[in-house]
Amino acid sequence: MASLKEIDSRIKSTSKMKQITKAMNMVSSSKLRRAEKNTKSFRPYMEKMQDAITAVAGSNSTSNHPMLKSRDIKRSGYLVITSDKGLAGAYSTNVLKSLVNDINSKHNDSSEYSLIVLGQQGVDFFKHRGYEIESSLVEVPDQPSFKSIQSIAKHAIDLFSEENIDELTIYYSHYVSVLENKPATKQVLPLSQEDSGQGHGQMSSYEFEPDKESILSVILPQYVESLIYGTILDAKASEHASRMTAMRNASDNATELIDDLSLEYNRARQAAITQQITEIVGGSSALE
């Protein structure tokens, strides 16, 4: 049995750890509220952007823009979104596991796909396992701005436009609620009929200048960048929710451990007192 001093030391260290996890839970809760607000605020912009795409591309089924045309898949592109930091439960692990399973089932070697990785967790995961990373972005802000992720979004689009990849799929954790986050995939290139042919509002008649193809060449890359950014906002909300849940569970486990240690401490203290009384009584009997 551990000594009273050892048990007391464990109680104190666990209590300090509980204070840390409780504080991290509160911080993650605050970040989650902001992330939810960011995602909600971005949604109307995406709907209006999709209306504009519908007005141009939806009425122009003969468009030859490469982002709207499917082609034979010779090389796939995967954009995977993970966290920079740990302590978020299985947030990054579930996404990475989903991607690796798909890579193993669809591809025979690394020449058939390219990896674009967001987050230090993903970078470390693939480097330690010998995967080749096309490009990466780490230290993504907790509340990312469009500018902070635009470079990697543009790089992914350029890979498709230059036919270095023939499709682009995002792997991320989709935020459903505080208690539910699930790995998800989203194909962003080539754009699907749903992306380019369905608006959210009442359509009006438009006149296009200089012409539809020129407009598409400008607006489609911006739209895909926005799709990627919106997905990152969703993933960030999921990350904060996962970390908040993990820290709450850690705090609850710490409370349970402190209770168990306190009970063990009291039993050990009672046993020590009983031993001391027994020794005193034994000593008195010997003197008689």
From Swiss-Prot:
Native source organism of the sequence: Staphylococcus epidermidis (strain ATCC 35984 / DSM 28319 / BCRC 17069 / CCUG 31568 / BM 3577 / RP62A)
Top-rank taxon, per record: Bacteria
UniProt record similarity statement: Belongs to the ATPase gamma chain family.
Keywords: ATP synthesis, Cell membrane, CF(1), Hydrogen ion transport, Ion transport, Membrane, Transport
Protein name stated in the entry: ATP synthase gamma chain
Membrane-topology descriptor: Peripheral membrane protein
Protein localization: Cell membrane
UniProt-recorded Gene Ontology molecular function terms: ATP binding; proton-transporting ATP synthase activity, rotational mechanism
Major localization class: membrane
Assembly, per entry: F-type ATPases have 2 components, CF(1) - the catalytic core - and CF(0) - the membrane proton channel. CF(1) has five subunits: alpha(3), beta(3), gamma(1), delta(1), epsilon(1). CF(0) has three main subunits: a, b and c.
A GO term from the CC aspect: plasma membrane
BP GO annotations: proton motive force-driven plasma membrane ATP synthesis
Function: Produces ATP from ADP in the presence of a proton gradient across the membrane. The gamma chain is believed to be important in regulating ATPase activity and the flow of protons through the CF(0) complex.
Pfam assignment, any one: ATP-synt
InterPro entries hit by this protein: ATP_synth_F1_ATPase_gsu, ATP_synth_F1_gsu
Keyword Glycosyltransferase recorded: no
Stretches assigned to coiled coil: none
